Amino acid sequence: MYNNSYHYYQWYYPVLAGWNNNHFHYGWSPHYYNWSHTNGNRYWNRSQDTIELRDYGPKPFVVNIEQATKQNNTFRTALWTGKHLQVTLMSINVGEDIGLENHPDTDQFIRVEEGQGLVRMGDRKDHLDFEQRVNDNDAIMIPAGTWHNVINTGNAPLKLYSIYAPPQHPFGTVHETKASAMASEQGPQ
């Protein structure tokens, strides 16, 4: 009835004569599914369904950011560092915070993937007049020059990722703990 219909009831799955349907099998086409993120990414581990968390920049890169963020157990890991943008993953332990900070020339975007927290922001270090609770899937936009802090108020690690424009940390940054992050920001003494 229809050209190249592969279903045993040819009228069940009609296919037009001009379609390239040589790959159809019971209504499934490989063109509808993109599995290249697994096969094409040599750092993807099929057996554990994990990704190697390291800095992939500045090369083109695609990642399941939710999976990578939830997988991360370090205080901070740079996932991608480019010329004008950086993506870092963070895991904030219960009762800890990212630390009160200010990036004079860097806008920042933070997305909470898992956990509960409190974000505080303000124009001065001693005057944080913006306060908002955050949960899973909340996004925080921090303008350059704004003092800010994110505090984990939940009973599990607060998993988030942060986007800096321009980059804030050196390529390949990995801070296992908040203490190591603070020590590296202070520099050698």
Regions found by a protein language model. Name each.
Residues 72-74, 86-105:
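Conserved short histidine dyad/triad with adjacent acidic residue
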Residues 105-124:
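Glycine- and acidic-residue-biased ligand/ion/polar-headgroup-sensing regions
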Residues 151-189:
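Double-stranded beta-helix
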Residues 1-84, 132, 178-189:
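A short, N-terminal "cap"/entry segment at the start of jelly-roll beta-barrel domains
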Residues 98-100, 119-120, 142, 148-154:
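Short beta-strand His + acidic residue motifs that chelate non-heme Fe in jelly-roll/DSBH
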Residues 124-144:
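Short acidic-glycine-tyrosine-enriched beta hairpin
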Residues 78, 87-91, 109, 131, ...:
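Conserved hydrophobic/aromatic beta-strand scaffold that supports enzyme active sites
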